[in-house]
C-alpha cells in the first residue's frame, strides 16, 4: 500500500508539473473578475472558463496568458474595477449587457499594447479627451452609449468604429481633428446628438459610412433635424443610411450626402422619412465614377413615394434594387441602368418603358402590382424575371416561342391573356441570319456569333449577347478548318453551323522561370491547346509545349532554355509554325538574354502626358523598341539602354491597363493605372521581367507545419504516455 500511495502522490505531482498554468498576476485578476461576475470558483484555472481564451506565452513555455475575453451578461449589473493591465497579451474583449468599464480602464488602456478589438454592449463612461489608445486597437464597437463620445476615440488609430442604439446623454463631437486611420464608421444620429460638420475632411480615408437616423416624431421632445455641409468624401466606397422604422417619421433630406460621394460602389437606404430636397427635386448620381459599378439598394423607404418626373438618375451600368417600396417607375431614369430589381411594389402601374435604356441587361420584377402587357422590347433583356405579378395583357412573341414549359419560368404566374403553363411553343418568326463570322479561337473560349429573330435566351453551348437576336455559341478547343457543330435552341429547334479555327499568328517572345527552370516562351494566337506545338526556328523544327493562357490574353508556348540553339545578343532569328494544316506568319526576332523594367507599376494621368521608364533594355538601337498601352502605341521621345521617355495617350480612369515594351520581339508587360488628373506618383521599383502572357500554374504540394509546431511530441501526449506507464506499474503491486 505504501508503494501505491507513493506512486499516487508522484503521479499527482507529475501531472501538476506537466500542465500549463496561467500567469500568476493574470490569475489573480481573472479569478476575482469571474468570481464577482458569475461566482466562478477562485481555485479553478480561469483559462478553463468558457468566457476566457488562453494560449502559451511562447512555444517553449507552459505558462498561459489570456488572449481573449468574452463575458456574457451577468445576473446583476457589474462595473469592472479590476486592473486589467496585467493582461498584456489580450487581443479581444467583448462585454455583454450589464457589464461596464470604468474611467480607470481607459486611463490605462494604452498599456494593453496587443489589444485589437473592444466590443461593449453597455457604455456609460466619459472618456477623457487626452486618452491615448494603443496603436494595436483596430476595432471599437459601442452599444447603448449614454454619454458623449470622446474626441479621443475619433482621433485614435482605430480603423473601425461602430456605434449602435444610443441612449439619452449620447452625443458626437461637432468638430474632429484630421484622422487618416479611420476606414469604417457607423454612427447613430438623433436630433440632440449633433454631427461632425467636417466629417469628410476629418476622415480622408474613410471607406464605409453608416448613418442610423432616429426619426420617431412620437418620441418625447423630438423635433426635425437635418445634416448638411458635410463636404466631399473622396474615398468613400459604401454609404448606408438607415432610418428608425416609425409610424410618425420626420422628413429628412439626404441630398447633402448623395451629392458628395464621387466614387462610391454601394448605396443602401432603409426606412421611412427620407426625402428628396424639394428645392433640388432630383437625386442625380450620374456623376459617380465607381471602380466597377454602383449598387443601389432601397428598402422600405419613402424616398421615391411622391416623386415628380424622373427624380432618380444613376451612373452608367448601375444596379438598382428595391424591396417593399411604393413608387412609380416614371420616377426612375433607366438610361444608365444595367440591372433593375423591384420586389413588393404596391403602386399599380404598367411595366417600365425601356426603349431608352440601352445598357439594361437584367430585369426582375416580382410580387408587385404591375398590370397590362409585356412589351416586345423586353425580349432583348438577357436576364428576365416577371413572376408573381398581376400582368393581365399579352405576352410577347419571344415568350410564345418558348411555350409554357420554358417561357413560364420567366413570366408565370400571371393572368396573361395569351399565355399559360400549357401553352405550346409557337414561333413562326424564328429565323437565323446566314452571314455569321465562322473563324474562332483555338483555346476553347472561342465563340460563333449568330444573329436572327426570336432565337431565345439559352441552349446547349449557347449564351445571350442580346437575348433573342444575338447569341454566342461556344466552340471547344481545336485546330484546323472545315469543322461543324450542331446546337439546340431554347425552343427545341436544331441547327448545324460550320466554322474554322484561326490560323496561328506569332507576336513576340520572352522568358519564364518556373521551379528554378528557365523557358523560352513564344506568344501569339491560334496555337494548339491540346497537343505540343512544332515551331520552326531558323529552319530547324523544335517541339514546344501545349499552349497555355488564351481568353482575353494571347496564348503562350514554352521550351526549356537548354533546348534552344545558342544565340549571341542581338542575333537575328526567324520563327514560324504550322498548326492544324494552317501556316503562321514568319517573324524575325532579335535575341536578348534579358529585358526588364525597374518599375513594378506605372500610375498615369487620365489626360495623357509624359513619363520616364527605367530598366535594362539590351540595346542602343532605338529602331528595335516599341511601346503600347492596351494596343495603343506610345511615342518614344528619349531613349538609352537603361532609360526611356514616352508620350502616353489619355485613357479612362482604371487599373486594368497593360504597358507592353517590345525590344526586337522580346516583350515585357507592366501594370498601368490611370488616375484622375494630378501629379503622377513615384512608381514602385520591383523589376518586371514578365513575358507578355504568364501561364497559370499550380504549386506543388509541399507538407507544411502549423505555426508554433516544432515537430516535437505534444505535452498532452507525453503526459498520457507516462500516466499509462505509472498505472501499469501500480497494477503490478496490487
From Swiss-Prot:
- Bias class Low complexity marks the residues at 680-712
Signal sequence residues: 1-20
Q: Where is this region: 4 X 4 AA tandem repeats of P-S-T-T?
A: 683-698
The answer on whether this UniProt entry bears the keyword GTP-binding reads: no
Q: Which GO terms describe its cellular component?
A: phagocytic vesicle; plasma membrane; side of membrane
Please, where does GPI-like-anchor amidated glycine lipid attachment map on the chain? Answer: 708
Q: Which InterPro entries match?
A: LRR_dom_sf, Sexual_fusion_gp
| Propeptide section residues | 709-734
Q: How does it sit in the membrane?
A: Lipid-anchor; GPI-anchor
Domain (IPT/TIG) ranges: 504-592
Sorted keywords for this record are: Cell membrane, Glycoprotein, GPI-anchor, Lipoprotein, Membrane, Repeat, Signal
Where are this protein's sequence repeats?
683-686, 687-690, 691-694, 695-698
Keyword Acyltransferase on entry: no
Which residue windows are coiled coil?
none
Q: Name one GO biological process term.
A: pinocytosis
PTM field? The sugar chains may play important roles in cell fusion. The GPI-like-anchor contains a phosphoceramide group, rather than a phosphatidyl group.
Question: Which parts of this chain are annotated as the region Disordered?
Answer: 678-712
Per the entry, what this protein does is: Involved in the sexual cell fusion of D.discoideum.
What is this protein identified as? Answer: Cell surface glycoprotein gp138B
Which species is this record about? Dictyostelium discoideum (Social amoeba)
Q: Name the encoding gene, please.
A: GP138B
